[in-house]
Amino acid sequence: MYPESTTGSPARLSLRQTGSPGMIYSTRYGSPKRQLQFYRNLGKSGLRVSCLGLGTWVTFGGQITDEMAEQLMTLAYDNGINLFDTAEVYAAGKAEVVLGNIIKKKGWRRSSLVITTKIFWGGKAETERGLSRKHIIEGLKASLERLQLEYVDVVFANRPDPNTPMEETVRAMTHVINQGMAMYWGTSRWSSMEIMEAYSVARQFNLTPPICEQAEYHMFQREKVEVQLPELFHKIGVGAMTWSPLACGIVSGKYDSGIPPYSRASLKGYQWLKDKILSEEGRRQQAKLKELQAIAERLGCTLPQLAIAWCLRNEGVSSVLLGASNADQLMENIGAIQVLPKLSSSIIHEIDSILGNKPYSKKDYRS
């Protein structure tokens, strides 16, 4: 799919300033020079997003200082990242406040940014959560106030709501778009059937269908993004924005000898992650990561870079959301772009053999 490096050293990124926000990436491998597709369409919409985005879950308004958050956003923006994702529930709304303050302080043109937020869990009251017309409209209004913005580019339904009729949710999403509070809407953690239902309702009543599903995707979770979402993309144009490329840090290799202090698994409220890492399955994953580490060394990159590049190599993925708690981590993650051209079919096959979890679609069984 991409040319392989002709040298043993890691591919070098050349950054050249252009009129557009941030920079354009191009990789050189002797000749001819070939430009990587750093910006991709979000699903079949016309919205152009950087293939890497910066997420704010756990970090903004929580794990890191506001100063560090500003440093990370600036670093991301200067390196061509235009997509910044948050949610009303992150740090009980504080993540949106921090994000909004940074955008205002930096004075970046709003038109150069793609800001996305998610609605479902708002306040403690019964009416302050879910996907009712009331909460979608009031929740997004409150989000925009915290962000100090007139609109977000994409508003996501943060999970399905079995207590609200699909037509009500789709009508409310269409309403906030028509009111100029959002440009597009998408889903997060919805099943293919639920997304298909939303699309059908939109078509039936001449409403706006969703353009994107936000899904967890990493080396140990593949089925949805590799089998289910491509079918939806071809049928109805829904794209994939993925999160947790390092499986909450598991794929980074930092947990290979236990739980280090200050890591996400050591935080209050993340006992589930700690249990996952220390489980039998967690130990098996760590053994596989040791084998993957050898491939990373051969390619001249780190394990996190290999894992992120592996997510990016999937053409059905519009953007991979990164989480970072310091500048070095973010720059390392952005460096995954350099690894992407080196993921030849033989390397991918080798990774699949180690993981042993490649999902198969119906058409694979037929062939």
From Swiss-Prot:
Residues modified as Omega-N-methylarginine are: R28
Listed under catalytic activity are: hydroxyacetone + NADP(+) = methylglyoxal + NADPH + H(+); (E)-4-oxonon-2-en-1-ol + NADP(+) = (E)-4-oxonon-2-enal + NADPH + H(+)
Residues modified as Asymmetric dimethylarginine: R28
UniProt keywords (A-Z) are: Acetylation, Cell membrane, Cell projection, Cytoplasm, Cytoskeleton, Ion transport, Membrane, Methylation, NADP, Oxidoreductase, Phosphoprotein, Potassium, Potassium transport, Synapse, Synaptosome, Transport
Could you provide one GO biological process annotation from this protein's UniProt record? regulation of potassium ion transmembrane transport
Active-site positions on this chain:
Y90 (proton donor/acceptor)
Report the SUPFAM superfamilies cross-referenced here: NAD(P)-linked oxidoreductase (SSF51430)
The molecular function terms of the Gene Ontology recorded here are:
aldo-keto reductase (NADPH) activity; methylglyoxal reductase (NADPH) (acetol producing) activity; potassium channel regulator activity; transmembrane transporter binding; voltage-gated potassium channel activity
State the top-level EC class.
oxidoreductase
Mod. after translation = Phosphorylated by PRKCZ; may be regulated by incorporation in a complex composed of PRKCZ and SQSTM1.
Modified positions (Phosphoserine) are S9, S14, S20, S31, S112
Membrane topology according to the record: Peripheral membrane protein
Query: N6-acetyllysine (modified residue): where?
Result: K124
Q: Where does the record place it?
A: Cytoplasm; Membrane; Cell membrane; Cell projection, Axon
Looking up CDD domains in the UniProt record yields:
Aldo_ket_red_shaker (cd19141)
Q: What tissue specificity is annotated for this entry?
A: Detected in myelinated nerve fibers in the spinal cord, in the juxtaparanodal region of the nodes of Ranvier, but also in the paranodal region. Detected in hippocampus (at protein level). Detected in hippocampus.
Question: What GO cellular-component annotations does this UniProt entry give?
Answer: cytoplasmic side of plasma membrane; cytoskeleton; cytosol; juxtaparanode region of axon; membrane; pinceau fiber; plasma membrane; specific granule membrane
The source's domain of life comes to: Eukaryota
Outline what the protein does: Regulatory subunit of the voltage-gated potassium (Kv) Shaker channels composed of pore-forming and potassium-conducting alpha subunits and of regulatory beta subunits. The beta-2/KCNAB2 cytoplasmic subunit promotes potassium channel closure via a mechanism that does not involve physical obstruction of the channel pore. Promotes the inactivation of Kv1.4/KCNA4 and Kv1.5/KCNA5 alpha subunit-containing channels.
Fill in the subunit field for this protein. Answer: Homotetramer. Interaction with tetrameric potassium channel alpha subunits gives rise to a heterooctamer. Identified in potassium channel complexes containing KCNA1, KCNA2, KCNA4, KCNA5, KCNA6, KCNAB1, KCNAB2 and KCND3. Interacts (in unphosphorylated form) with MAPRE1. Forms a ternary complex with SQSTM1 and PRKCZ.
What PANTHER family does this protein map onto? HYPERKINETIC, ISOFORM M (PTHR43150), VOLTAGE-GATED POTASSIUM CHANNEL SUBUNIT BETA-2 (PTHR43150:SF1)
- Domain remark from Swiss-Prot or TrEMBL: In contrast to KCNAB1, the shorter N-terminal domain of KCNAB2 cannot mediate closure of delayed rectifier potassium channels by physically obstructing the pore.
Family statement drawn from the similarity comment of this UniProt entry: Belongs to the shaker potassium channel beta subunit family.
Q: What is this protein called?
A: Voltage-gated potassium channel subunit beta-2
Q: Which gene encodes it?
A: KCNAB2
